[in-house]
């Protein structure tokens, strides 16, 4: 594309067909990334201005995406027509900054201005921002997993931190709960805020019954089952003095494949827990998300293939409940 860099958060749903077409037309690909497909489309455009080449490209792609591009003279941000993936605008002195989350702006001392709107392109040149809206208006449909899991707790989503949204998820989960226990234990760090909201609403004791090694990354997004299983052992350890002989309500943000939940429940029982009741601060995940979440097939999703009782038995818990869809809507305000 001649002097352009592209960074991409999301997933293109028509990347394979676009790639095949480009290869037939003579394009040479150096990676398997769908981001390169976007670069190839920009390079192929016959338009003279870079911004017009970008518009040509994004009219051909489908999916959930937030793009940040740089040329020698400009910074460009693009958000998909439904706003599935977030993109934020900040200001540092007289200059503009683009980032997927507001916490990135905080770190460098930039002031959060606003989100890039769904279907909007922002062109920044000579410290001036121009808004371009090439798509017809669409209803915003952000990915709910940004609220549940992806975004860092201190990042803003709809003028509330992800932490506040997750506490609300825990509060709504507590409203649907009919069980009393000795302690509420989060799966760190993803379940921390929801567990706190849950415990506060029911006036129950909140305890860190699991201690996390922060030098190990997220197990949910690891590519293979073997690595995910090993990751749980390396990442978490039971705090025996806190959980021994206790009836526990274990709170996590979500249950996708069940790998992590099974290992954690076993870990708690091995450490002396009397009962482990699992409560999940989002509804059952039964269908794949092709817009950027690592759930490629229905076969991998536990809730798509087992009943609630079967999942409970599979993970080894005394009982299992998920937040209702209505509870999710109330918590996030959709």
What is the meaning of each model-derived region?
Residues 203-249, 259, 286-296:
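Short, glycine/charge-rich flexible loops or terminal/linker lids adjacent to PRPP-binding catalytic cores
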Residues 31, 36, 206-217, 314-332:
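A conserved beta-strand->alpha-helix junction
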Residues 1-117, 123-181, 187, 275:
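Conserved short alpha-helical segments that host acidic/polar catalytic motifs at enzyme active sites
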Residues 14, 84-85, 105-106, 130-131, ...:
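Flexible loop/turn segments at secondary-structure boundaries
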């Amino acid at each position: 594309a001649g002097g352009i860099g592209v960074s991409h958060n999301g997933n293109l749903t028509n990347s394979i067909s676009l790639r095949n077409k480009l290869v037939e037309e003579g394009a040479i690909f150096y990676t398997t990334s769908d981001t390169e497909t976007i670069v190839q489309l920009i390079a192929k455009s016959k338009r003279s201005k870079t911004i017009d080449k970008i518009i040509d490209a994004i009219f051909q792609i489908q999916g959930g995406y937030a793009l940040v591009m740089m040329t020698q003279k400009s910074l460009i941000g693009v958000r998909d027509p439904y706003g599935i993936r977030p993109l934020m605008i900040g200001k540092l002195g007289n200059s503009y900054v683009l980032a997927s989350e507001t916490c990135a702006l905080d770190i460098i001392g930039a002031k959060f201005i606003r989100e890039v709107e769904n279907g909007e392109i922002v062109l920044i040149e000579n410290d001036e921002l121009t808004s371009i809206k090439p798509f017809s208006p669409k209803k915003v449909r952000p990915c709910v997993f940004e609220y549940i899991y992806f975004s860092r707790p201190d990042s803003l989503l709809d003028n509330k931190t992800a932490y506040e949204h997750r506490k609300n998820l825990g509060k709504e989960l507590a409203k649907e709960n009919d069980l009393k226990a000795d302690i509420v234990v989060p799966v760190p760090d993803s379940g921390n805020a929801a567990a706190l909201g849950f415990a506060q609403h029911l006036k129950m004791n909140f305890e860190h019954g699991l201690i996390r090694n922060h030098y190990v990354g997220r197990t949910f997004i690891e590519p293979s089952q073997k690595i995910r299983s090993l990751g749980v052992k390396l990442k978490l350890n039971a705090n025996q003095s806190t959980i021994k002989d206790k009836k526990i309500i274990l709170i996590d943000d979500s249950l996708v494949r069940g790998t992590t939940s099974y290992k954690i429940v076993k870990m708690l029982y091995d450490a002396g827990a009397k009962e482990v009741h699992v409560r999940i601060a989002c509804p059952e995940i039964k269908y794949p998300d092709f817009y950027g979440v690592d759930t490629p097939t229905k076969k991998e999703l536990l809730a798509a293939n087992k009943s609630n009782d079967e999942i409970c038995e599979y993970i080894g818990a005394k009982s299992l409940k998920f937040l209702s869809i209505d509870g999710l809507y109330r918590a996030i305000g959709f």
